[in-house]
Design a protein with these regions (language model features):
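Residue-level signal for inorganic ion chemistry
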Residues: 26, 67, 105, 164, ...
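Short beta-strands and strand-loop turn motifs
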Residues: 16-20, 46-49, 75-79, 104-109, ...
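A glycine-rich helix N-cap at a beta->alpha junction
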Residues: 63-78
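Classical nucleotidyltransferase
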Residues: 86-192, 214, 300
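N-terminal catalytic cores of NTP/NDP-binding nucleotidyl/phosphoryl-transfer enzymes
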Residues: 6-61, 65
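Short acidic-hydrophobic, aromatic-tinged amphipathic segments that line or gate anion-handling sites
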Residues: 1-8, 76
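Phosphate/ribose-recognition catalytic cores of enzymes acting on nucleotide-derived substrates
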Residues: 182-301
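Short histidine/acidic/glycine/proline-rich micro-motifs that form metal-
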Residues: 23-24, 50-54, 81-83, 110-114, ...
């Protein structure tokens, strides 16, 4: 799959296009992508409205990772502000028809298009003028409720990982580059990988989690701390740092996909010094190891 950020780069001349925020790449979005990729005579193109300021479940890089293997051949990331500022007709003419060469456009049945908030029927009428047809996808529901980004955000904030998996259709992920931190983990005898994540990414509440880190086609069990480290007073900013079990390699600069599976405990300050910290860490590691061993057993079954 090709991922570009320039709408006017050379694109296929006959495309099937889906557009929107696709925040969460959840079951509803997956239904749209399935329809998008069903037209074998057209090139499937996904236009993602990229947010750089508003909070998001998934960044553009994370969306790219999740699109691999779906059948989508082109992902185009365009600034959300620019896309949303256009009225529906301008968007249909300049973006869908001229830039993306759309022959078929796939939208959810309740989609709104443009700054003037036109519906799918209005887009279909515009398509008659600009050379494309519109296909709608029914709303996807789970347990009687529409699957939505808002429902997923509530699950993230509540640390409801089973609910997240149900709505996302997979485990919640965080993606980023391993960056140099303060090396605070080393003084506790457990060097950690510090993940540089986008500042506008919606993360689970501060705490300790059981995770899998994906690098170069392999995955590694880990214990991840999201948030402040109250026992290290010189580190006042939130971090995402992972202690990888049975792993001792230099991975600075590597891209990591972090799957977050389970909440272990909240962040707390230890007054008893390094011995107390180490005792708690050992307890956490054993809990993470037990849980993640079962996760891996199921993955490899």
């Amino acid at each position: 799959m090709k991922h570009i950020t320039n709408l006017f780069e050379t694109l296929p001349m006959s495309a099937c296009v889906a557009f929107g925020h696709f925040d969460g790449m959840h079951l509803g979005h997956q239904a749209v992508m399935e329809k998008l990729c069903s037209h074998l005579d057209l090139t499937p193109v996904l236009l993602s409205f990229a947010q750089t300021e508003k909070p998001v479940i998934y960044t553009e890089r994370e969306k790219e990772y999740l699109l691999e293997g779906t059948g989508v051949e082109w992902m185009v990331s365009a600034p959300a502000k620019e896309m949303e500022a256009m009225d529906a007709e301008t968007f249909a003419r300049e973006v869908l028809a001229k830039a993306l060469h759309a022959k078929i456009v796939v939208v959810g049945e309740n989609a709104t298009i443009g700054a003037d908030a036109k519906d799918a029927a209005a887009l279909a009428a515009l398509g008659e003028a600009y050379g494309f047809t519109v296909e709608t996808v029914p709303t996807v529901c789970f347990a009687g409720e529409p699957v939505s980004s808002q429902a997923i955000i509530k699950a993230i904030e509540a640390m409801d990982f089973p609910r997240m998996r149900e709505l996302l259709g997979r485990t919640y992920i965080m993606q980023g580059e391993v960056v140099h931190g303060k090396a605070a983990g080393r003084k506790h005898g457990m060097p950690t990988a510090n993940l540089g994540v986008a500042p506008n990414k919606i993360s689970p509440p501060h705490g300790v989690y059981g995770t899998l880190s994906h690098m170069d086609g392999k995955y590694y069990r880990g214990m991840t701390n999201i948030g402040l480290r109250p026992s290290d007073d010189d580190i006042p900013i939130p971090t995402v740092e992972t202690f990888l079990l049975n792993f001792d390699q230099d991975i600075y600069g590597r891209q990591v996909i972090l799957e977050v599976f389970v909440y272990i405990r909240g962040v707390k300050k230890f007054a008893g010094g390094l011995a107390e910290v180490r005792k708690q860490i050992d307890k956490d590691i054993e809990q993470v190891r037990t849980y993640m061993d079962e996760v891996i057993r199921k993955l490899e079954a």
